[in-house]
Amino acid sequence: MGGSGSRLSKELLAEYQDLTFLTKQEILLAHRRFCELLPPEHRTVEESLHTRVSFEQILSLPELKANPFKERICMVFSTSPTRDSLSFEDFLDLLSVFSDTATPDIKSHYAFRIFDFDDDGTLDREDLSRLVNCLTGEGEDTRLSASEMKQLIDNILEESDIDRDGTINLSEFQHVISRSPDFASSFKIVL
């Protein structure tokens, strides 16, 4: 990545800065990290902007490896029809949303999409169960019993389901998140 052909143009950098919450330095670092995942023959700027990286490769990044929602994060940000890879722009979008400077509304919108495992626009009991299992782990010693899970989900819905339809929609989720001062600072990935 040392040659002059391996740097993003000033125009492209400016465009990415306008479209994301990232600084010029963060964009350059993101490009370098993305290119490290590409085969050497695809590391030119032109190739890197048109080559997709598999989830397997993206998930090898230390910043994502330990995240319990790593697969969902990749799926939500992938523009691939098969949702199995990320382009550089997908990768930038991901990093932008998880940056310190992204707005709480943007962060909560994407958190909702990540937690909506069945992509139906609501968090139902199954989504909430999967969310809890991701957070607690699915090992014998950490997994909640069926009655504990039911009680926890009942409590979550009691607190969050304002319209009492048995699910949490985006506005209900954002209302709950707005009362959580640590959410925005904990919803981040730093390269």
UniProtKB/Swiss-Prot annotation:
Positions annotated to bind Ca(2+) 2: D161, D163, D165, T167, E172
Keyword Transport recorded: no
Compartment list: Membrane; Cell membrane, Sarcolemma; Cell membrane; Apical cell membrane
Keywords, ordered alphabetically: Angiogenesis, Apoptosis, Calcium, Cell adhesion, Cell cycle, Cell division, Cell membrane, Cell projection, Cytoplasm, Cytoskeleton, Differentiation, Lipoprotein, Magnesium, Membrane, Metal-binding, Myristate, Nucleus, Repeat, Spermatogenesis
Membrane topology listed for this record: Lipid-anchor
Lipidation (N-myristoyl glycine): G2
SUPFAM superfamilies in alphabetical order: EF-hand (SSF47473)
Keyword field contains Thylakoid: no
Domain EF-hand: residue ranges: 103-138, 148-183
GO biological process: angiogenesis; apoptotic process; cell adhesion; cell division; cellular response to growth factor stimulus; cellular response to nerve growth factor stimulus; cellular response to tumor necrosis factor; cytoplasmic microtubule organization
One Pfam family it belongs to: EF-hand_7
Residues given in the record as Ca(2+) 1 binding sites: D116, D118, D120, T122, D127
Record GO terms (molecular function): calcium ion binding; calcium-dependent protein kinase inhibitor activity; magnesium ion binding; protein kinase binding; protein serine/threonine kinase inhibitor activity; protein-membrane adaptor activity; small GTPase binding; transmembrane transporter binding
Tissues in which the protein is found: Expressed in cardiomyocytes and neurons (at protein level). Expressed during early neural development.
GO cellular component: apical plasma membrane; axon; cell periphery; centrosome; cytoplasm; dendrite; endoplasmic reticulum; filopodium tip
Superkingdom, natural source: Eukaryota
Additional free-text comment from the UniProt record: The binding of either calcium or magnesium significantly increases the structural stability of the protein in comparison to apo-CIB (calcium- and magnesium-free form).
Record function comment: Calcium-binding protein that plays a role in the regulation of numerous cellular processes, such as cell differentiation, cell division, cell proliferation, cell migration, thrombosis, angiogenesis, cardiac hypertrophy and apoptosis. Involved in bone marrow megakaryocyte differentiation by negatively regulating thrombopoietin-mediated signaling pathway. Participates in the endomitotic cell cycle of megakaryocyte, a form of mitosis in which both karyokinesis and cytokinesis are interrupted.
Subunit details: Monomer. Interacts with the heterodimeric integrin alpha-IIb/beta3 (ITGA2B-ITGB3). Interacts with ITGA2B (via cytoplasmic domain); the interaction is direct and calcium-dependent. Interacts with the protein kinases PLK2/SNK and PRKDC (via the region immediately upstream of the kinase domain). Interacts with PLK3; the interaction inhibits PLK3 kinase activity. Interacts with PSEN2. Interacts (via C-terminus) with F8. Interacts with NBR1 (via C-terminus). Interacts with FEZ1 (via C-terminus).
Record note on domains: The EF-hands may also bind magnesium ions in the presence of high Mg(2+) levels and low Ca(2+) levels.
Protein name (database record): Calcium and integrin-binding protein 1
Species name: Rattus norvegicus (Rat)
Encoding gene, per UniProt annotation: Cib1
